[in-house]
Amino acid sequence: MEETYTDSLDPEKLLQCPYDKNHQIRACRFPYHLIKCRKNHPDVASKLATCPFNARHQVPRAEISHHISSCDDRSCIEQDVVNQTRSLRQETLAESTWQCPPCDEDWDKDLWEQTSTPFVWGTTHYSDNNSPASNIVTEHKNNLASGMRVPKSLPYVLPWKNNGNAQ
């Protein structure tokens, strides 16, 4: 059965389904077919085991240990593990020498030294004092036309407000 998996790089290659020998499936669709066919053939699926290195490999349960020891995809996984452990060792050895630069900013001091007043929508500024608190006058402007008023409620009823009745 392993001969059908040797050229898995060709997406158009036909592979035989391990659950139904009459099924010839293109390699690019094979994983999807395996999932569907496994559900349709639970009796055959219970006799087969999935290779831990390649889910496309479905082998009889009695032969899984032999397949694991001789699987071609095992070398790819082992090489990935070796590369990851090497990179982790190199990362732990190389300690960072970066240091935070000294901070010479003082935002509070800059705020008091600021000559222009901050912009606040809907307010006017009258004072010459540079204190930020004294620059803002609490005079609210009404920009609506003389015949218009602000609505007293939202244009829709909120779900938790049911005409003043508690639920």
Curated annotation (Swiss-Prot):
GO-annotated molecular function: tRNA binding; zinc ion binding
SUPFAM superfamilies: beta-beta-alpha zinc fingers
Protein name per Swiss-Prot or TrEMBL: Gametocyte-specific factor 1
Keywords, sorted A to Z: Cytoplasm, Differentiation, Metal-binding, Phosphoprotein, Repeat, Spermatogenesis, Zinc, Zinc-finger
Binding site for Zn(2+) 1: C17, H23, H33, C37
InterPro entries with a match to the protein in the record: TRM13/UPF0224_CHHC_Znf_dom (IPR022776), UPF0224_FAM112_RNA_Proc (IPR051591), Znf_C2H2_sf (IPR036236)
Renumbered zinc finger spans (CHHC U11-48K-type): 14-41, 48-75
Record carries keyword Zinc-finger: yes
Pfam families found in the cross-reference section: zf-U11-48K
Annotated Zn(2+) 2 binding sites: C51, H57, H67, C71
PANTHER family to which the protein is assigned, alphabetical: GAMETOCYTE SPECIFIC FACTOR 1-RELATED, GAMETOCYTE-SPECIFIC FACTOR 1
GO annotation, cellular component aspect: piP-body
Chain positions found as Phosphoserine: S8
Intracellular or extracellular location(s): Cytoplasm
Protein family membership: Belongs to the UPF0224 (FAM112) family.
GO biological process: cell differentiation; piRNA-mediated gene silencing by mRNA destabilization; secondary piRNA processing; spermatogenesis
Job description of the protein: Required for spermatogenesis and is involved in the suppression of retrotransposon transcription in male germ cells.
Record's keyword annotation contains Transmembrane: no
